[in-house]
Amino acid sequence: MIFVLCLLIAFWTVLLLFPYNTAQQDLILAIFHLREYAPMTAAELAHMHEVEYYFVAALILTITLCVYAYKQPKPYWHVTLLCVLLSPLTLINFHQTWDMLHKIFFPQGNYIFPYDSYLITTVPLEFFLQFSVATFILAVILYTVWTCVYYRQWVSSFLSSLSSRLSK
């Protein structure tokens, strides 16, 4: 659970700080309606409009998990372990993972474009691989910091409880 939250926070952080070229910046700004989309085919525009919905869903999920993690700070190790194990595996065979995710999230098939299309030339697969690696590394760092802080508090609480029992 916490690792998923760390992944989402890392995603938004990398999204803000990633070194984009001008065309990529324009595309990201268009997703957030801060700029008009560049000339694209109807299929590319339909794909980008769906991507907008996924960005909104990711933002809602991030906020929801932040609130939930704040109210329920106990770890969910089974979810965390699954995410920690699956994340590097997805990076090992990124092309296949990328294709599978697109088949799941875009079942109507509007994610396959010619190699010379605007989207493919602006944000090629290598861009998403670098973005994903940066997101994963930052998520691991955030999770490590959270774990250290959480366990420091837990150990302190445990030792305090233990010493009060022993002093009785």
What are these regions (language model features)?
Residues 5-20, 76-99:
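Hydrophobic alpha-helical membrane-insertion segments
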Residues 9-50, 97, 117-118, 123:
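Long, glycine/tryptophan/cysteine-rich extracytoplasmic
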Residues 27, 92-114:
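Juxtamembrane non-transmembrane "cap" segments at the membrane-aqueous interface
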Residues 38-64, 128-135:
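Individual transmembrane alpha-helix segments
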Residues 61-66, 135-147:
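Hydrophobic cores of alpha-helical transmembrane segments in multi-pass inner/ER membrane proteins
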Residues 69-77, 154-155:
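Membrane-interface helix-boundary motifs at transmembrane edges
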Residues 107-127:
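Short, membrane-exposed interhelical loops at transmembrane-helix boundaries
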Residues 147-163:
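Membrane-interface capping segments at transmembrane-helix boundaries
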